[in-house]
């Protein structure tokens, strides 16, 4: 499970060092793809395969499903971390997420997310007020 917030830097070759806590789960390979809110989703290969299988169940007659699957999969890149735990983020994904040098890598349960540090801080500041007001109606059985 991916948890916490980490602050790696993007190097001049477009690589990041994965947080140590994430490396074991991602050692055999990972998939980077466009995330919602202009971040990059990071999935283990196994989790991405599970998601892909569920996407295959979506009806082809659903325009919304087709659109989502196209955007999600066309931005995907499978990567294998090097021995130092570094992963190259493809230029198109770096541009999509507006990544600068300072990053925030957050754990989101079954995935990690890579954010530009300023964008993450802005998002978090914006959402924290609503977070404190979330009730059982919005997330049944969760709180």
Swiss-Prot record:
The answer to whether keyword DNA-binding applies is yes
**Which GO terms of the cellular component aspect does the record hold?**
cytoplasm; nucleoid
Q: Which CDD domains match?
A: MraZ_C, MraZ_N
Keyword Transmembrane helix annotated: no
Q: Where in the cell is it found?
A: Cytoplasm, Nucleoid
Quote the subunit structure annotation: Forms oligomers.
Q: Which PANTHER family match?
A: TRANSCRIPTIONAL REGULATOR MRAZ
What is stated as this protein's family in its record? Belongs to the MraZ family.
HAMAP family for the chain: MraZ
Report the protein name in the record. Answer: Transcriptional regulator MraZ
| Organism annotation | Paenarthrobacter aurescens (strain TC1)
């Amino acid at each position: 499970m991916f948890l916490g917030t980490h602050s790696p830097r993007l190097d001049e070759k477009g690589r990041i060092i994965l947080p140590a806590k994430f490396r074991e789960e991602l050692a055999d390979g990972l998939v980077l793809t466009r995330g919602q809110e202009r971040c990059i989703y990071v999935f283990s290969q196994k989790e991405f395969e599970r998601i892909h299988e569920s996407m295959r169940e979506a009806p082809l007659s659903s325009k919304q499903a087709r659109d989502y699957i196209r955007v999600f999969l066309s931005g995907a890149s499978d990567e294998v971390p090097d021995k130092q735990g570094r992963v190259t983020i493809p230029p198109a994904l770096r541009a999509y997420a507006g990544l600068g040098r300072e990053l925030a890598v957050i754990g989101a349960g079954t995935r990690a997310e890579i954010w530009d540090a300023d964008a993450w801080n802005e998002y978090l500041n914006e959402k924290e007020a609503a977070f404190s007001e979330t009730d059982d109606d919005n997330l049944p059985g969760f709180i």
